[in-house]
Swiss-Prot record:
The keyword Disulfide bond does not apply. It is an enzyme of class 2 (transferase). Residues 1-15 are cytoplasmic. It is a single-pass type II membrane protein. InterPro entries: Put_SAM_MeTrfase, SAM-dependent_MTases_sf. It is found in: Golgi apparatus membrane. The lineage of its organism: Eukaryota, Viridiplantae, Streptophyta, Embryophyta, Tracheophyta. It comes from Arabidopsis thaliana. Belongs to the methyltransferase superfamily. This is Probable methyltransferase PMT7. GO terms for biological process: methylation. PANTHER family: METHYLTRANSFERASE PMT7-RELATED, SAM-DEPENDENT METHYLTRANSFERASE.
Length: 600
């Protein structure tokens, strides 16, 4: 297919919807929360009336990128015209959660363990190598905090959840918007009421979840993540996840709302998070069979929970006496008792256990052959593509949490010492990123509301995220699985994140991040070869960054030069700025911004 045209579209329809929304929801931010809904359009030159049918009045200009379905080849060569654009039907392309590819694998997967819901990345030759387009009528997302309750319907144009979950107040259609009332399967009257009840249950009616010591939560099968959204006023950070399954596009809704979430499933492999990272694991009708397979999934929860952490279970076995629910409940009681958990509350459709810090109990139960204790070798490596373990460990990090999040952000996590990172290096990193983040905001020159979903693609010890903590945004701290395992230290700072290998695409929908930060990421991967090339990682960055989103790149001079040359071919604008590194040496930092384009 041939080249196309650039046409500048009118924002008038978006402005009309903006006015309607302001009338509906009251005194929000008078337009600044809606962004600029004026994309450039790519159309086929064969369309004889492309100029007249366009919403633009400014006329066409040349646009070199071609619309053509292109696959990854052994030798990567980007055309002079720029990276090809995928056809419109691929606007929700998620390489490692591709239903068509997974269907080919079904005969070899353990369906009883729901292995089909996990990551399955196709071989290179079956991966697309073209820019993923936005859907028809895509608009710059509504800004936080309005986005918690309202998002553009055209950005996630799927009605299934509204049809099957409307009675539970997950999401409702309101004209050209989706409205999220804050409900869920077990809290259809609203998450705030449910969260207060959990606080009462964990504190014996004396406080809330925060006073119960809950600061970091893992929400299993999170739906549209309203639970996480309404934990935010308490200052509680939640890692929400759900599979790409029959609950159509639930994670896409969550991310469009500006809530931390990722596609994942608890099935046959460990979750991509370190041991002892969460104060609470929450399951509200999460569709996980915890009682099956000798409770191996419950043992994964045990791995993830900190000592004295809570497991919240809101599901029929906790309260119903019909069908096989009592049998399931008995199995859960036996499993949790074997792991030395204590049932502290059971009422109003919810049961809560606490993982007691009782090594003597675990060793006694191991002697009674009620449980198996993991060997040291089982807990020593990053949780990336590691099979689930049918055992429990007793060597989780028991570092005492500082009294406040501010203290945690600046306190040296002792786990970093085991990774060869000194307290002086920690302090240097923390102070450096405070300075850099201030300069980043000046150089980006955007309203703080324009950046909500942020990813640090090579987070090291979380200094960048710690420096960003005072802004109205969240950061997904990614620690590459092939690098020093510092993610447990990041969690000890009160931050969150995940392991990942950038030789593969990330488990998220297209257009989900406003800012990607890459500090010497490309340098690390330049020795890994096919699938990990600079061009591969740039393509994945383009897939997951939102239109008008920023990509900040710091790296070796040769890599910075290469990215600067390639950026226009990915339809990125690029600026270079001279900043100082940690050791006061000047380095070139690239500020790339993805153009807002669409297929006409």
């Amino acid at each position: 297919m041939g080249g196309g045209y650039v046409l500048f579209g009118s924002a008038r329809s978006g402005q009309m919807i903006m006015v309607a929304l302001v009338l509906m929801v009251g005194s929000f931010y008078a337009g600044s929360i809606f962004g600029n809904n004026s994309p450039i359009y790519i159309s086929q030159p064969s369309s004889s009336n492309s100029s007249s049918s366009s919403p633009s009045q400014s006329g066409p200009s040349n646009f070199a990128n071609k619309i053509e379905l292109t696959y990854r080849r052994t030798s990567v060569s980007i055309p002079e015209s720029g990276v090809n654009v995928c056809p419109l039907k691929f606007n929700e392309y998620i390489p490692c959660h591709n239903v068509t590819y997974v269907q080919q694998l079904l005969p070899s997967l353990n369906l009883s363990r729901r292995e089909e819901l996990e990551r399955h990345c196709p071989p290179l030759e079956q991966r697309l190598f073209c820019l993923v387009p936005p859907p028809k009528d895509y608009k710059i997302p509504i800004r936080w905090p309005t986005s918690r309750d309202y998002v553009w319907r055209s950005n996630v144009n799927h009605t299934h959840l509204a049809e099957v979950k409307g009675g539970q107040n997950w999401v409702h259609e309101q004209g050209q918007l989706w409205w999220f009332p804050g409900g869920g399967t077990h809290f259809k009257h609203g998450a705030p009421e449910y969260i207060q009840r959990l606080g009462n249950m964990t504190t014996n009616e004396t406080g809330d979840l925060l006073s119960a010591g809950v600061e970091q939560v893992l929400d299993v099968g999170c739906g549209v993540a309203s639970f996480a959204a309404y934990l935010l006023p308490l200052g509680i950070k939640t890692m929400s996840f759900a599979p790409k399954d029959g609950h159509e596009n639930q994670i896409q809704f969550a991310l469009e709302r500006g809530i931390r979430a990722m596609i994942s499933a608890i099935a046959t492999k460990q979750m991509p998070y370190p041991a002892a990272s969460f104060d609470m694991v929450h399951c509200s009708r999460c569709r996980v069979d915890w009682h099956e397979n000798d409770g191996v999934l419950m043992k994964e929860v045990n791995r993830l929970l900190r000592p004295n952490g809570y497991f919240v279970y809101s599901a029929p076995p906790a309260y119903r006496k019909d069908k096989d629910f009592p049998v399931i409940w008995d199995k859960l009681v036996n499993l949790t008792s074997a792991m030395c958990w204590k049932l502290i509350s059971r009422k109003v459709q919810t049961a809560i256990w606490v993982k007691e810090d009782d090594e003597a109990c675990l060793r006694k139960n191991a002697e009674l052959e009620l449980i198996t204790i993991c060997g040291v070798e089982d807990v020593s490596k990053a949780s990336w593509k590691v099979p689930l373990r049918d055992c429990v460990d007793i060597s989780e990090n028991r570092q005492q949490k500082p009294s406040s999040l501010t203290d945690r952000l600046s306190s040296y996590p002792t786990s970093l010492r085991e990774k060869g990172i000194s307290e002086d290096e920690f302090t240097l990193d923390t102070n450096f990123w405070r300075e850099q983040v201030n300069q980043y905001w000046e150089l980006m020159n955007v309203n703080k509301t324009e950046v909500r979903n942020v990813m640090d693609t090579n987070a090291f010890i979380g200094g960048f995220a710690a420096a960003m903590n005072s802004y109205p945004l969240w950061v997904m701290n990614v620690v590459p699985a092939t690098m020093n395992d510092t993610l447990s230290g990041i969690y000890q700072r009160g931050l969150t994140g995940a392991y990942h290998d950038w030789c593969e695409p990330f488990s998220t929908y297209p257009r989900t991040y406003d800012l990607l930060h890459a500090d010497h990421l490309f340098t690390h991967y330049k020795i890994y070869g096919e699938g990990c090339l600079l061009e591969d990682i740039m393509l994945e960055m383009d897939r997951i960054i939102r239109p008008q989103g920023f990509i900040i790149i710091r790296d070796e001079e040769s890599i910075v030069s290469r990215v600067r040359d390639l950026a226009p071919k990915f339809l990125w604008e690029v600026e270079a700025h001279e900043l100082q590194d940690k050791y006061k040496k000047t380095e070139t930092v690239l500020f790339c911004r993805k153009k807002f384009w669409a297929i006409l």
